[in-house]
Amino acid sequence: MNAENNIPIIELDKKDTYLREISSKYSTHHYYDVSVCRESGSWRIELTRKAFASRLDKNYHGKLFEDHIEETRVFAAVLGNRQVGWIELGYDKWNNRLRVWQFLVEEECRTRGIGTLLMNHAVKIAKEKGARMLVLETQSNNATAISFYLNFGFELIGFDFAAYSNEDLEKKEVRLELGLKLQ
């Protein structure tokens, strides 16, 4: 299916959208192992793709239109009469970046180009806004998403070894920040 020609993208409104909470799950066989080594006068940080001993299944629950997001815009991909993918964007005026706060394609609709369609739409919105970069967060254990973002042109711009817990390194779930330069 060529999503570009067949799937409309609509903008949702906070006042009339039925969808406030979103849920997703993903399975992965790989992760990026993050190692941090402090040596005399320097830090050495490596991210190495490795295989889990067995498949990891993760569930995610989030909300759209959170109050803390500045200039929120939410878009949905519509297949037939059903919304099957969403991307939530927020503009960070202080550093002129557009952030992807939520990005989800329903599991049965993945690998059909819907994610690419939504991300292309986010790039269009970011350029219209004059943002210098499109940024997002993912986790080091979501190798499939990381591959998608890297293939799209995103690069690693940062990480947080304790974003979710004090044991993120041990859990193989390190917050990664990825960015796509637009200017």
Where are these regions (language model features)?
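Conserved glycine-rich acetyl-CoA-binding loop
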Residues: 82, 106-120, 124, 128-129, ...
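Short, charged, low-hydrophobicity "junction" segments
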Residues: 1, 124-135
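Generic detector of contiguous secondary-structure segments
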Residues: 7-21, 131-146
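Alpha-helix boundary/capping detector
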Residues: 44-49, 107, 115, 126, ...
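C-terminal "cap" of GNAT-fold acetyltransferases
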Residues: 2-6, 132, 139-143, 152-155, ...
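Acetyl-CoA-dependent GNAT
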Residues: 13-14, 18-101, 106-108, 119-121, ...
